Amino acid sequence: MKKIVTLAGDGIGPEIMAAGLEVFDAVAQKINFDYEIEAKAFGGAGIDASGHPLPDDTLAAAKTADAILLAAIGSPQYDKAPVRPEQGLLAIRKELNLFANIRPVRIFDALRHLSPLKAERIAGVDFVVVRELTGGIYFGQHTLTENSACDINEYSASEIRRIMRKAFAIARGRSKKVTSIDKQNVLATSKLWRQIAEEVAKEYSDVTLEHQLVDSAAMVMITNPACFDVVVTENLFGDILSDESSVLPGTLGVMPSASHSESGPSLYEPIHGSAPDIAGKGIANPISMILSVAMMLRDSFGETAGAEMIEHAVNKTLTQGILTRDLGGLANTKQMTAAIIANL
């Protein structure tokens, strides 16, 4: 039996978590997948329960889980507080050594009109951004004085090698192309990044490697996003480019993500926030959460059939014109969830 720890969090988190688990249970019955759920407080809910966004019992449960589902964190009441929900996310990434953030970017045909790009620009877009999550300038030394400031960007060969291998492994199961993004013409870290990328490429002779400078890649992501298959880059560049890629579908409501460690549990979550303005109204779009469940089935448990079942059901539901308000429709959370289950 697989143990899944759920972190419903704040805002619309509990509502979309319930939707995700409802779909998960329906699929689990169809594929005979045996599991148990352990729900834990996290984010603002963790602060309310224990004074910390990542309570000790939540962390202990997460460390022994086979996978972790996170819905959403954040609440206006903590915006100016010394202890904030977002600190829990940074803490759990560090404690579980979640070094690889995986963000799929796919355009659903039924939602093409929502994209800010012309139809011909987004046709065929289906790529994955692989972002190194625990190294680089965010985790370097930061110095600030009255007249100067300094941030240290540091990467080791081993840190680069493991994220590269993750990207190449993902590409091997897709269209076998990796685009490594750096700033090799200026930065020493990028020179090492490119060197290690070339070394790892030799281990995956069936996968094509290309390099792009980050400024060029940012431009191509708008002018020709369909050219990408797997994009891999360091923490700062990945933070920016993954957010850029998230606007291509025209909505955050259909985008899941995963964060992987080397040997421990992975964490799956929507990329959108807690949307406190609509919390409790029953109108939140659950698709990002539901697709995060699909990612969990595929990546953590090897249940490709179950993952595809969910993805096909979501696509069919959207094609039928069943849309939540953020997508231009009238369906509420429960109606969208029920429609997806009916289409499994």
UniProtKB/Swiss-Prot annotation:
Pathway: Amino-acid biosynthesis; L-leucine biosynthesis; L-leucine from 3-methyl-2-oxobutanoate: step 3/4
EC number in record: 1.1.1.85
Pfam families, A to Z: Iso_dh (PF00180)
Cofactor requirements of the protein: Mg(2+); Mn(2+)
UniProt-annotated binding residues for Mg(2+): D215, D239, D243
Catalytic activity as recorded in UniProt: (2R,3S)-3-isopropylmalate + NAD(+) = 4-methyl-2-oxopentanoate + CO2 + NADH
Compartments reported by the entry: Cytoplasm
Top-rank EC class of the record's enzyme: oxidoreductase
Site feature: Important for catalysis: Y138, K183
A GO MF term: NAD binding
Cofactor binding, note field: Binds 1 Mg(2+) or Mn(2+) ion per subunit.
Binding site for NAD(+): G273, S274, A275, P276, D277, I278, A279, G280, K281, G282, I283, A284, N285
Keyword annotations of the record: Amino-acid biosynthesis, Branched-chain amino acid biosynthesis, Cytoplasm, Leucine biosynthesis, Magnesium, Manganese, Metal-binding, NAD, Oxidoreductase
UniProt xrefs under Gene3D superfamilies: Isopropylmalate Dehydrogenase
GO biological process: L-leucine biosynthetic process
Residues engaged in binding substrate: R93, R103, R131, D215
GO cellular component: cytosol
Superkingdom, taxonomy of origin: Bacteria
Family stated for the protein in its record: Belongs to the isocitrate and isopropylmalate dehydrogenases family. LeuB type 1 subfamily.
Known function: Catalyzes the oxidation of 3-carboxy-2-hydroxy-4-methylpentanoate (3-isopropylmalate) to 3-carboxy-4-methyl-2-oxopentanoate. The product decarboxylates to 4-methyl-2 oxopentanoate.
Subunit relationships: Homodimer.
Protein name: 3-isopropylmalate dehydrogenase
Provenance organism: Streptococcus mutans serotype c (strain ATCC 700610 / UA159)
